[in-house]
Structure formats: structure tokens, C-alpha cells
């Protein structure tokens, strides 16, 4: 099956047709899911997702290895020879409509229709012919897209065997796709008795670099273990998980920007945003007043308030108020006011990594990687700087201007190590990260709280509870817990677009599994609660009992005569009492609760200066107590 799936630019997915059901290792769990059916369901689910989340992406479905053939206006009944035999273009590469999604769903659910289209061919399919067909589709339908990708889903790791001519032709066609800017990504399906081996054929046609940016870390090695499914359900889930993890291409935030290490010493880098919060956004306005919903096109018109005359664009001037007067600026002058120079990343100094607090990362970090387009040798210099920062645990302070007319940003450039999973698959490539540093107004002061430490028995028992509730291998995988509100938003839009029933409640995978929690840690939680009661009783028993009884004042002889106000006598506290009180607040980290008079009395008793504001007094008291006690 070839699924031509296009993302912001384009993508195509292929799988050689295999209708044989996959045997299940579990005899109680029978499965009748063939790789072809699983791949079609995967394409259908992806089309459902992308039609809502990325409505401008182009997606297509191309089947290969079929007995029937279809390519645009050609079919089995056309005159002459077929251009691409055994290739069936089920859905053309285009922005998918609701009708095309329903057709693909019908193919997945309708067995009779699927048997006609998914009938395997008797002859082997030429991969060179298939790749040339894909080349024609991309050239005709998406000639100007930056990111075009071909997803190949197959369980045949050696389609041509020892036929060197067919293998050589396929290699040439794959190079043509690479030169065209198409990235080929493989999703192998391993059989129970045979593991998929990419070295037999597919390593020769899949390039490990992006065609648009050969130096960018765009290649991800296929995860064969993920697709080593033993039944149809796990096969489908594995395909969806694998494709979803690579469904979004790494788009460059900027390309070929100068990284200035010193005067007249520059290299070129490209920047990527690898982590970004995904939110539901309104892409257009829809008019519901007619028989069918239509996309509304907004038009803005400026009208004079006094005469209702339409104001032309050249009549509008922008001004700023200075001293009560309006000072007008021309568009060129406004641009010059916002011009801080050409886009650049300039290193202005270095600091230890320990000086960068964890709370300084309040915006999206920027991942940068070297490119050789502007300056030859950039990769070598970048690698040397990366290794030096990583080895010495340093960060570089940079002056960063993202684009023209953008405000400059002070950032910390730090080296990030490569991260791989348990199978050795790269998850995060090695490179540099630029973290925009916050200004003083961006950081709030934490509220002052007293540190309360629980008794050791409570801590020990809670440690057991936490160990029972840890995630597998102690690692949180965000891909297993999608944003429930965002998915619910997409699910409603999908139901409206495909004329489906609106679901009653969302599928929220972030809700705790209370039964499983009770089964694994319920007994330990009850033991912890009993220990909490014991510790509370022990703490309250050590404290003196307080009373709410108050002594009544003596009755006056003449109730009509107002009693004189009681005289307040100021109790003079000794130096020992002040020291004990200050020491107590120091241990509880609540020195700020003391009054200025108390702080000055304490400093005077210690022979220190008592002049200054409260902040200065607190600083002197802390220095004194840290050195003395």
C-alpha cells in the first residue's frame, strides 16, 4: 500500500500489498488484521487527524502491488500500455475533503469493495516504477512545497531479491526523489518468524539527511521493535504511534543565520523549535446563514467618523504623543526606530552552567545546528564549541536577533547531549540550545513559607507508596497522554465535518486509574494514614494545652462612672529572650516576620550597627547567625 500523506508540504506512505491475516501469538486473542488493512486504517486515522489539526496539508493514498491499476485518467480499460502498472492511486495528493475521508473509511470497513481493490498482483512490482510514479505525483501536485515526504509501510524487506538491475533502477529513482526535495521514511512491519532487515534493500534508497538541509538532524531510524506486532491490534497501534511520532517535520525557524564567536569570526547555523505548546486556533470564519456553511472572507474599511467617508491607506499616518503633542513618523522612520541590526547570534561572554537557574526557561528554547551553506567549516567550529561547553559545564551568553525588525533577546546558549531510548533510537539529537533569559519583570518573588519537615517514619512509608505508583521505567512519555481539551476540540470538528455522531464525553487519558492505584498502593496508603495519626497524636501530646478561659474583670463600685483606661506597661525583654526569639525565627526561615525594633535590639546586643532599612537589618542578622550559630 502506498499512502501519499502530505503534511505542511507533502507526504506519501507505501506498503506492498499483503492480504494474509497475521497469526496471533495468543490463541485466546484471534486477529484477522492483515498488514494492508492495518496500513489503510492507519492512513484513515491520520487523514482524520490532519484534516482538522492541519487543514492545509495535502494527503494522498497510493496502493501498489495491486492487480488493478489506476493513475489519473488511466485505468484497465484505457488504450495502450499502462504507465504505472500495479499502482492504484486511490486518493489523489490534495487537501482531503470529507468525501475522500469517507471513501477511505468505506474501503477499510467494506470487505467486498476491499477485495476488489486490494487483490494482489501476480507479478512482482518494480520499486523503480513505483518511485517514479511518486515523483510524478509530487511534481504535478506539489512542486513548490518545502517539506515533501514519502511514508513507506511494508513487510517485504527485499522486494527484488538478487535482481541487480531492478535494485540499481530503484536506487536511481530514489536519488531523483531526494534531489526533488522528498524525504523517504520507512515504517517496517516484522513478521513473527522473520524480522525486517533494512540492510537488504531499503538502506540503499533511504537517505539519512534532509534534502532541504543536509546538515539538519532530520533522519530517524525506523523502530523495528515498535512494529514487531504479533496481532492486528498491536500492529495498528504500533503504526499509529510510530507515524505520529514523526508526523510533524522539523521546520526551520531560521536558516543560515550567522553565529558570531568574535570579531570577523562567524559560522552559519539553522534554528528549530522542537518543543511548542499546541493549541486550538481559529483558521477562518464560517458563515452559517445559508443552506451550506461557507468560509467568510473579511474585508476591513477605514471610515471617517464625521463624514462617513472611506479613508484611503495613504491618508493614514501614525503618531506618538510626546509632551501632549502628536509627533508623526514616516514608515521609513518607524522601521529605523525598530532596527537593531541584522539577524545574528552574537556570543558576548561565558558563565558556569550552575549560574543558570532552572526557572529561567520561561519561553520556547531554540535548537540550533550548523550548516555549511554560507561558511565552509561551520560544522567543525560548531562541534569544537559544543564539546568545550559540554566538557567544562559552561553556557554562553548571546545577543540574539531572530529576524529583521525583531527585538533583541539576551539568551543562554548551552550544549545538549544526545538522548536515545532503550532501543538505541535517537529521540533528541545533539546540538546547542538557546534559552531566552527573562527580564526582572518576568520573575515573581516566591511567597515566604515556613519549612515544615515530616517525621522520618512518615517519609519512609510515603517512599513505598511512591515506588508503587511509578510509571514504567520511571519515565513519563507525553505521547501516551494527549491533551484532552485539544483532542476533544478536534473530535467535535471531525464529527461535524464527516457527519458523524457527536460523542457524549471526551476520552481523557490523564484521569488517574483509581482501581489500579488502589490495587497497587491501597494498603500502603492506609498504613501511612495510621502512621500519620500516631505522629499527630505524638506531636499534640508534647505541646502545652491551651485554654480559652479568661479572667473576668472586677466589677466597679459605681457602674455609671466610666472606668479609666488601663495603663499599658511595656515589658522589657532581656537580651537572652531576644536571642532565643531571633534564633527560633532563623531556624524556621521566618526572620522577615520580626519587627524592625526587635532586629535593632538584637544587633545592638551583638555590637553591630543598627542603622538602615529592614532589608539591610535582615541581611546583617542572617550573616551574623550563619557565622555564629
Swiss-Prot record:
Where does this polypeptide localize?
Answer: Nucleus; Chromosome, Telomere
Q: Which reaction does this enzyme catalyse, per its entry?
A: ATP + H2O = ADP + phosphate + H(+)
Keyword line: ATP-binding, Chromosome, DNA damage, DNA recombination, DNA repair, DNA-binding, Helicase, Hydrolase, Nucleotide-binding, Nucleus, Telomere
Fetch the InterPro entries from UniProt: Ku70, Ku70/Ku80_beta-barrel_dom, Ku70_bridge/pillars_dom_sf, KU70_core_dom, Ku_C, Ku_N, SAP_dom, SAP_dom_sf
Its Gene Ontology molecular function terms?
ATP binding; ATP hydrolysis activity; damaged DNA binding; DNA helicase activity; telomeric DNA binding
Supply the EC number(s).
3.6.4.12
Per UniProt, the enzyme's principal EC class comes to: hydrolase
Biased amino acid composition, Acidic residues: 1-18
Q: What is any one of the record's Gene Ontology cellular component terms?
A: chromosome, telomeric region
Residues of the region (Disordered) are: 1-33, 543-575
In Gene Ontology terms, what is a biological process of this protein? double-strand break repair via nonhomologous end joining
Ranges where the Ku domain occurs:
259-468
Basic and acidic residues biased stretches: 19-31
Q: Where is the SAP domain?
A: 591-625
Family, per the entry? Belongs to the ku70 family.
Q: What does this protein do?
A: Single-stranded DNA-dependent ATP-dependent helicase. Involved in non-homologous end joining (NHEJ) DNA double strand break repair. DNA-binding is sequence-independent but has a high affinity to nicks in double-stranded DNA and to the ends of duplex DNA. Binds to naturally occurring chromosomal ends, and therefore provides chromosomal end protection. Required also for telomere recombination to repair telomeric ends in the absence of telomerase. ku70, of the ku70/ku80 heterodimer, binds to the stem loop of tlc1, the RNA component of telomerase. Involved in telomere maintenance.
Please give the subunit comment from the record: Heterodimer of Ku70 and Ku80.
| The protein's name | ATP-dependent DNA helicase II subunit 1
The taxonomic lineage of its organism, from the top, reads:
Eukaryota, Fungi, Dikarya, Ascomycota, Pezizomycotina
The protein's gene is named: ku70
